[in-house]
């Protein structure tokens, strides 16, 4: 939507909220407005839990998932919850919600309180999360059909206070956005079949003030890959699901463990305040200063390189520089990306912000990542973007129920992909 149209739509909403001193309405308008940017680096902080409680504090003891065949099914039904009390069982197909065909109800679900939705896949995911949320005490009429039953049932469910339980269960934001700092930024292990597994939380070093292993993150990663090389592993899984991003240079340095030749990682294209124009500069990540105009960031040829099959596990919570790990692996001769959906699609340079009335702050990116042809890469446009799987894992009922029960379906498919490349 053009800026003038956005202003025309949201300025009156903000003006009414100001006139009536309705902070909840102002906060929701601010979130809806920033969501139109469709970038994971555009956010409103902090989360206003008063608004969350008022708008989405009630749940129905229900989590739903959309299958590849278009059906919306129950993948978690809380014992003793409203849905279970109405006779709904795991795998039940939701036919209607709040008197509307579920497809329409889903499309009309407000996701103002969700994280940003750069891609269409993320939009649908967030609509599924908030479809089953409502103010406490709200009644919703639902038509559903349990597996094995010949006819559907109709029930009225009442939203109950649940401590935002289902929102917490389905929160797919990046790791550092939703939890405490880990004890180390890189974890490694050897899986059955002599497969190396390494998980990267983010491309930053653990702060010295935080408890844990303060070995530099790059060193931890190189130690892991070098140990796999020495052990002659049959393949490597690099898990960047919900990776929070960080340093682009660190990602390029990670990739040296897989690249025999110097390869462009990106050109960083920044808006120069003095001119308002984009220019390619290499940034000093420690000082924030722009150095080396026109220069790109390169993956240097590694001194010790793994050349066997590599798989990157991704989800939509993998954001920013974390997406660069998936991109670098996908570009390898024996590299594949595995996941139900692609990465977040937010690959620009983040860091700018502005303070807003009522104590809120809006963050946004100020630079672009360009490929060798100096075209924006990975960032979402028109709802499409991110680093996509070579072949998406099918969201079947069986897979959806496995995921909901805690089974690592993505790793299972990742191991299959490795075996196919051996």
Regions found by a protein language model. Give the residues of each.
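Extracytoplasmic/secreted proteins, especially bacterial periplasmic and envelope-associated proteins
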Residues: 5-12, 16, 25-32, 36, ...
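PDZ domains, with a preference for the canonical peptide-binding region formed by the helix
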Residues: 18-22, 93-143, 250, 345-348, ...
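Envelope-exposed proteins and targeting segments
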Residues: 58-60, 68-73, 90, 138-140, ...
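Sec-exported extracytoplasmic/periplasmic mature domains
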Residues: 1, 11-22, 31-42, 79, ...
């Amino acid at each position: 939507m053009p800026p003038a149209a956005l202003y025309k739509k949201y300025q009156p909403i903000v003006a009414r909220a100001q006139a009536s001193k309705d902070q909840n309405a102002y906060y929701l308008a601010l979130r809806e407005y920033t969501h139109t940017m469709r970038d994971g680096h555009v956010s409103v902080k902090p989360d206003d839990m008063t608004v969350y409680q008022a708008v989405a504090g009630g749940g129905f003891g229900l989590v739903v998932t959309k299958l590849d065949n278009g059906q919306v099914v129950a993948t978690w039904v809380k014992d003793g919850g409203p849905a279970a009390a109405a006779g709904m069982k795991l795998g039940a197909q939701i036919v209607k919600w709040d008197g509307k065909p579920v497809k329409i109800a889903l499309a009309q679900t407000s996701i103002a309180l969700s994280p940003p939705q750069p891609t269409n896949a993320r939009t649908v995911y967030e609509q599924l999360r908030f479809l089953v949320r409502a103010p406490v005490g709200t009644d919703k009429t639902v038509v559903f059909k349990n597996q094995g039953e010949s006819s559907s049932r109709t029930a009225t469910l009442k939203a109950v206070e649940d401590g935002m339980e289902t929102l917490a269960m389905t929160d797919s934001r990046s790791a550092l956005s939703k939890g405490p700092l880990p004890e180390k930024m890189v974890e490694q292990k050897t899986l059955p079949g002599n497969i190396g597994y390494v998980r990267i939380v983010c491309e930053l070093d653990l702060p010295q003030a935080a408890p844990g292993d303060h070995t530099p993150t790059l060193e931890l990663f190189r130690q892991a890959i070098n140990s796999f090389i020495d052990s002659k592993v049959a393949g490597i899984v690099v898990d960047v699901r919900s990776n929070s991003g960080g340093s682009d240079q660190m990602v390029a340095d990670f990739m040296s463990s897989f690249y025999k030749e110097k390869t462009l990682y990106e050109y960083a294209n920044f808006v120069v305040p003095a001119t308002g124009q984009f220019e390619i500069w290499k940034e000093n990540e420690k000082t924030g200063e722009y150095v080396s105009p026109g220069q790109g960031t390169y993956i240097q040829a590694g001194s010790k390189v793994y050349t066997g099959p590599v798989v990157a596990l991704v989800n939509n919570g993998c954001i920013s520089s974390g997406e660069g790990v998936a991109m670098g692996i996908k570009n390898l001769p024996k590299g594949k990306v595995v996941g139900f959906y692609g990465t977040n699609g937010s690959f620009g340079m983040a860091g700018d912000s502005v303070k807003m009335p009522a104590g809120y702050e809006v963050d946004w990116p100020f630079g672009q990542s360009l490929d060798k042809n100096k075209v924006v890469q990975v960032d979402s446009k028109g709802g499409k973007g991110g680093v996509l799987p070579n072949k998406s894992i099918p969201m079947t009922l069986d897979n959806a129920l496995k995921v909901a029960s805690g089974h690592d379906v993505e790793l299972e498919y990742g191991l299959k992909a490795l075996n196919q490349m051996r």
